[in-house]
């Protein structure tokens, strides 16, 4: 009996060992990086549908090197149209196209473990399987055009399904765009959820903190939303801002709202100003309650009250602050208090928002490591001297791990309606705008100055040391050692492509990916693609270019920044995950050898 158990166990271990060996020798997954989507849902959906220009590159990798760019473009166009058409220049018939498509699919599916048969629609699944296996198929497949055309349709569908294995989003679904909800629904949908890795951005932290119940972040979230007149977003999320709107329009005359308010509607402008004042009052309370944050320089209301009291308002562009008590400027008026308390409760209990943010709290992280890459939104806090900056007793990887624990705990309390810790809620405020936050990276967020001070020099928000340090070999080596990685991928900071700036450092260790989805950055958005053969950046098309390309059924114009090329396709065994799998394989092999030794001893006895 013992011998039978031993043999059964050897069989189980052998199967596990073979699965690990297969995975180790599989190609790394083709991965897309995108960052800073900034609420631009339609543009994101459009570019995602086109797979960020990956179709041409995949066809190029999967087909013989003798194929001209024109021939590859012709085949890619058929995939997009899902329909064969003749081209006198290329002289390829339906059979030629079918065999090329099979070759592309075989390239993507060979040495890959993360595929399943769902990439094929059921009608031609068996036929495609035979073609991939090199088995004969019935003659009508090639001889009857109506059947060939349907097969080309199904092959085109399958090719689009296998273009992309993983999507790494580097944060900031929220900001100035009106459709963050659309983006989250796409990323969390059954079609994409299992292939998405998400790291938080500072604007995500803002909304997450507001939903958890941080008072100042509730005011700030709504202030930014009103600043861009995104009332449809608030309506879709079922927020009731009628009381706020009535108070704002009654309290703040539009002609007196002369600060740098951006809302285009009178209603939005009044609400923006009302929320700005409420936000500053709530921030002052939090900063005073948590002096160890060292943010006392952000306390402006005492100074504002003194200006208003003495009439020395020449530095200001706006002096209409009817709800500020000059003797106690950070005190909320009775009506402000009632309004913000109602809004806080709406944020905490809003089921529509909770459905969206569940994806962040449960699936998101402060950083993510894959294929020897560290993925972060903005930075790892560092000092002028190139050391890791300490915050609350933590630094480097330990700091990001600590923040992750707080976010996860806060998220669980939020999702299951449990009481929150005041310290945890306050931390979200610091993560949003504190100088040592891994999501921000500047010495201060100058919201007050930009709204109300005439002197533009005081509006400047100076970046700290991350960008400079990431140009230093010593700091890059420090990052590699701290996280056990080879490259660092980060977003948050736009890369000005129009001025000739590059995404990657010369050695390819530091790569700055910013999707440029905010309207101000439409001409400098980037994505990053890693295939088993290449690592390259894509300069994304503008919305106008996307529309014109869709009409012509052609790819939008893309510029490529090649970062690295690999003579042999990269395998899982070449990655950090592969090293862990190799350790697991060695343990299993040790057990198998132990059982084998026991069997030999048993035979001898």
UniProtKB/Swiss-Prot annotation:
User: What keywords tag this UniProt record?
Assistant: Carbohydrate metabolism, Hydrolase, Manganese
Identify which top EC class this enzyme belongs to: hydrolase
| Keyword S-adenosyl-L-methionine belongs to the record | no
**Molecular function, one GO term:** fructose 1,6-bisphosphate 1-phosphatase activity
Q: Which InterPro entries does its entry note?
A: FBPtase_class3 (IPR009164), Metallo-depent_PP-like (IPR029052)
Cofactor annotation: Mn(2+)
**EC number, as in UniProt:** 3.1.3.11
Pathway assigned in UniProt: Carbohydrate biosynthesis; gluconeogenesis
Mind listing the GO biological process terms from this record? gluconeogenesis
Pfam families in UniProt: FBPase_2
Top-rank taxon = Bacteria
Q: Does the keyword Signal apply?
A: no
Q: Which reaction does it catalyse?
A: beta-D-fructose 1,6-bisphosphate + H2O = beta-D-fructose 6-phosphate + phosphate
| Transmembrane feature ranges | none
Q: What does the sequence similarity comment in the record state about its family?
A: Belongs to the FBPase class 3 family.
> Which HAMAP family is this protein grouped with?
FBPase_class3
Protein name per the record: Fructose-1,6-bisphosphatase class 3
Which organism is the protein's source?
A: Desulfotalea psychrophila (strain LSv54 / DSM 12343)
